[in-house]
Amino acid sequence: MKQLLSLLIALTFSSISYAQDNRVPSKGLALFSKDGNFEPYEFSRHAIGDNDILIDILYSGICHSDIHAGRSEWGNTSYPFVGGHEIAGRVAQTGKNVTKFKVGDYAGIGCIINSCGQCDNCKQGLEQFCEKGMVGTYGSHDHFHDNEITQGGYANNYVVSENHAIKIPQNADMKRVAPLLCAG
């Protein structure tokens, strides 16, 4: 746990510039095997789309689901694995069609980061049953972005559709908000 906290603190103070039209560089903590320890990991997230927001992560909770997935106890974990689906942070950039957020707003992310938004289930707010397949925060094939494997919130940033982010009041204590996002 001390190792994880030390690495998270180091990531918080590292500087990354954001690409406008390209993939977003990210730094996180990853497991490279089910028996490994967290290690620093540099990767990239998909480019910020017209309906996406880029969140600078302030806090990410640790859920037992992260432990199960990281140890591949549910099977088929892809490594390197960056866990974390209880994400609270500040909006750093918005796509041109974003209406729910502005730069500087607090935002949260739960366990689902994308769905088609068009099928009957999505229209009823049941994105977890998206007929085209929902995209999870980590370890999920993102079929909306070249089928890349999603990486979670044990990182410095996250790109997410505005429809799958939650606006957090500016007076919220963000370290207490992150664990509330466990259920998405």
What residue ranges belong to the model's regions?
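Positively charged n-region of N-terminal signal peptides that target proteins for export
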Residues: 1-4
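NAD(P)H dinucleotide-binding glycine-rich loop of Rossmann-like/cofactor-binding domains
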Residues: 116-184
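Boundary at the C-terminal end of the N-terminal hydrophobic targeting segment
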Residues: 17-19
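Extracellular beta-rich ligand/substrate-recognition surface
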Residues: 30-37
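Glycine-rich beta-strand-centered segment in the early N-terminal region that forms part
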Residues: 46-60, 73-123, 128, 151, ...
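Short structural boundary motif marking the start of a folded domain
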Residues: 22-29
